């Protein structure tokens, strides 16, 4: 796009909380947008409140009338839970562009078995998988098909009764199956090893636009040890508009007829595992992601135009900053994480030095001019640079400037699982 899709100052409302919402707000504001945020949960309000006006869902149960009143030009959801809100249809009927697919297209992420069936239909490699309604059915399936399985909720949502449990042996799988909530059943997916990677692109105007290849460090501790955390502890991002690793060609391009059939327009992420020289789909998502999104907005030269163009289902021209082709994300975790039932004290958070890259506050609050930890994930440090090595070094340089008693961060981002396909 040689000209902006919005000649005036575009008004953008983010739906979300925490560092992910704050990052989108600041990055888009820096590119000329007027930003605000609809806070969708009870926590993580501090970061967005520093970047623009906020509305709290408990005080404003339906944001659509205010969106119309304010003349909002674009809505950017951080999660798919907007699609189950009571005001979803009113938002869709309003005509306000949304950076998200809707209707059947949303099922690509929402319904894990729907994604599996799509892969089967279009010849895309997918691990052995099964939806079980209760423990007996799940147990019997594993006994009949003795492999380690990843246990997921069949329906993807932030409040799902089952959060992803990665089992690396048959015995681990059988043990965990005794301890999960079967209120929505379980989705069992063959464990494919640790050689995972992801790619995020945009679908717009009936075409797929490759964007970035990314790695998420999902386990809590160095050496990829400990449990899979509720959100990654770090990540790497590489601008990849030419599909350097073939993920778009193998795992997204075959879905192009379906994208067009469902009028899909929005972000799409595929997470895949490499086995025997072949990429297998693990899951699809329809948002920019908690680790990649904040870096992506900095890596693009024209993020406002890109976001508006995709939301309007137009052809787009993505332009990356050549000096920001690589990104690194680090999470500062607080007392008790990733064991979220452990509640820590009300500890102070101090920034000891001027940041030289983005620091986005997550579960913190302010009182009497001081900042305090209010949850388990304190901050996300996001860097972008001209090389991966420089991006990693910049992120580590800045996370050291944050102090909170008993907090921690991973020290080994980039030392494994990169480049894509590495152990």
Report each predicted region and the residues it spans.
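ATP-binding N-terminal substructure of ATP-dependent carboxylate-amine bond-forming enzymes
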Residues: 1-102
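Short acidic-hydrophobic, aromatic-tinged amphipathic segments that line or gate anion-handling sites
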Residues: 53-63, 129-134, 165-168
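A conserved helix-loop-beta module that forms one wall/lid of the active-site cleft
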Residues: 99-164
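Glycine-rich phosphate-binding loop of ATP-grasp-fold ATP-dependent ligases
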Residues: 127-129, 149-176, 187, 193-200, ...
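Phosphate-binding core of ATP-grasp and ATP-grasp-like enzymes
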Residues: 180-185, 192-239, 248-281, 285-292
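Active-site "cap" helix and flanking loop/linker of ATP-utilizing ligase/carboxylase catalytic domains
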Residues: 248-269, 285-354, 367
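Generic C-terminus detector
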Residues: 373-423
